[in-house]
Regions:
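Acidic, low-complexity intrinsically disordered segments
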Residues: 41-76
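N-terminal segment of the canonical double-stranded RNA-binding domain
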Residues: 1-37
């Protein structure tokens, strides 16, 4: 499943995946920075296994917001 959310001039994309051999879900985080030069996408590792698809996505979006609020540096 995938969620995209606009946040403070960025786009947070959270993707979750169900594990095959174990119960639970893992997720990936991408943050897009849109500016006059185009779009820069930065990927982040999201630690942990989540009990549900929804909890994985919610946690990943919160991590994305924290990264933006903390002033991460987009990769060029």
């Amino acid at each position: 499943m995938k969620v995209r959310e606009a946040y403070k001039g960025h786009v947070i994309e959270a993707m979750s995946f169900e594990l095959r051999d174990n119960p639970g879900f893992v997720s990936e985080l991408f943050i897009e920075k849109h500016d006059s030069e185009g779009v820069t996408v930065t990927q982040f590792f999201v630690p942990g296994v989540f009990k549900s698809d929804e909890s994985a996505l919610q946690a990943t979006v919160l991590i994305g917001r924290h990264k933006i609020d903390s002033g991460y540096a987009p990769r060029a």
